[in-house]
Amino acid sequence: GIPVSVGGGNGMCESVGAGVAQDGAYYMSLDTAAWIAGQSKEPFFDPQRRLGHICTLDGRSFSVFGAMRCAGKCVNWAQKLFEVGSPRAFDAAASNIPAGADGLIFLPYLEGERSPVYDEQAQGVFFGMTQQHRREHFLRAVLEGVGCGLSQILDVLRERGEILDLRIIGGGAKSKVWKQIIADLCEVRLHDVTTLSDSAATLGAAAAAGVGIGLFD
């Protein structure tokens, strides 16, 4: 018959696919939602509910993480709302606006939020609007708003120790403009993984299957 191996959830498999296998290593998943996660020998209990933890795929350690409900979902929403033809056109428009979007700020809470403040009722906001703001400003503000949310998560994770480098996976990792915005806001170096950025979870699941059939340890 066909051998069946026990796998894991999306976050468990993505950690393996991103190559995060040692204590203190971190990665960022930038997709419809987003999170930053790092491996830890011990579980992390946060009474303020800013972070969570799950077991790693091998069950030997833990993945400590903070997550945003809407990341790429905000970009997709803005792309439709402002009738932007493609992700490439979105990036081109946003890159023509200076950092800070001339004072226009976006809060990316289109479906509530998880980290660092868990609030099901949180709502998205554009504020600081003036007559000088054009469509391009709103697009830039969306990218920066998500970046600021990720920076808040990283600030909490840094209470556990210094974080200077992050591997990045997910569909959002294809955007050079967005990655630069996030790197600047989070003050980190972002490293693309060698596998396809949006296939990390699949790679992790394949690794679990390989271990299950004895292909490798």
What are the roles of these predicted feature ranges?
Residues G1-I169, A173-D217:
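Active-site core segments that coordinate phosphate-bearing ligands/cofactors
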